[in-house]
Amino acid sequence: MRGLKCQKGRLGCLVMTLAGFIFYAFGVFYYSLLKEAPSVWHIVCEKDSGQTEEDYERVMKTWEKDRQEKDFPLACAFWKKEEGQTAENLSLNRTCDVTVWKVRGSLEVLVQSSAVLNEDDWQGCYLAEDTAWELFGSTEAAGNKIVCGQRRLTVRGVLKDETSLLVMRPETKETTDRIALGMTLAAHVKGFLMSYGLRGKPMSSGFLAEIAQWLLLLYPGVLAAGFLKSLKNDYPVWAAGKILWWIMLAAMVYLLFRNIKIPETMIPGKWSDFQFWKDWWKSFQEQIVCFVQMDKTKRELRQAGIFMKSAVCSAMPFFIIALKKEVCQ
């Protein structure tokens, strides 16, 4: 009876070990989604440096050339956000509250859905799906007319992944206070700002993938240390269990090498360059604070959700280790 109970306990420990590996695999999966997600740099301009239409056109004149020669972002948008606005369908006498984005440049760098407006289409707009429902009772709203502020607009399409949003082109005299840049490196963002004499603080959600990968490195390290410690003991009965653990460790290492890549921002000229690590840590802390404080689009909120899933899955194996100490002792 005692031997049977002992075997059941060992089987339970193996099951929990496998469960920890499964959680870890999901953590790697969510990390891979986060790594592949397009990261957008948001630049909030200083209060006295709003961008006019002339500023935007000046950038666009040399955009294609600079993109190829200086590895500048593939897309950019100059925009501003106006909250607490009202959109109205006069024919049905329906209104709803919306946040208005007035955008010069690429819309797709800001919204997750496919959306295209001509640069001079001041009478066109896009509506979020729920906004279209409130105004028209349907998401088939293209071609319908609405009023927002002093402007009469024609709906060009519906944004499926956004909420309470209306996107339009700003009028000629309007200034914008934000810049969005498509996926690129931090160094390229700084080069972009310097090249065009723009001022503002860059912010991005790309650092979330860096945090996620560091969390994923912890469990294999702890597991390897435990395996090395277990080699000092001789438990013939546990030979199969040890083999299983080594297989799991090898699988984790394979997943790590296949999916994790150390970003260039974390590679110093010399590993003993302590000033580099000090500056990197300071910059990393600033990114976290900026991300918490920044106005997030649906894309950033979705990436934050994926990060949380990866972080939870990375932490679950440690919870299982603690549980095993209680069950398997």
Per-region residue spans from a language model:
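Juxtamembrane interface at the cytosolic side of transmembrane helices
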Residues: 214-264, 320-329
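The feature marks short, hydrophobic/small-residue-biased sequence motifs that occur predominantly
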Residues: 75-119
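Membrane-proximal extracellular/periplasmic loop immediately following the first transmembrane helix
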Residues: 28-87, 276-279
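Solvent-exposed, non-transmembrane alpha-helical starts
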Residues: 51-55, 121-123, 162-167
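Hydrophobic secretory-pathway targeting helix
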Residues: 1-39, 329
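Hydrophobic alpha-helical transmembrane segments of polytopic membrane proteins
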Residues: 310-319
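A cross-kingdom feature of multi-pass membrane systems that activates on extracytoplasmic/periplasmic
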Residues: 181-228, 261-309
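Mid-to-C-terminal secondary-structure elements
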Residues: 103-114, 127-195, 200-206
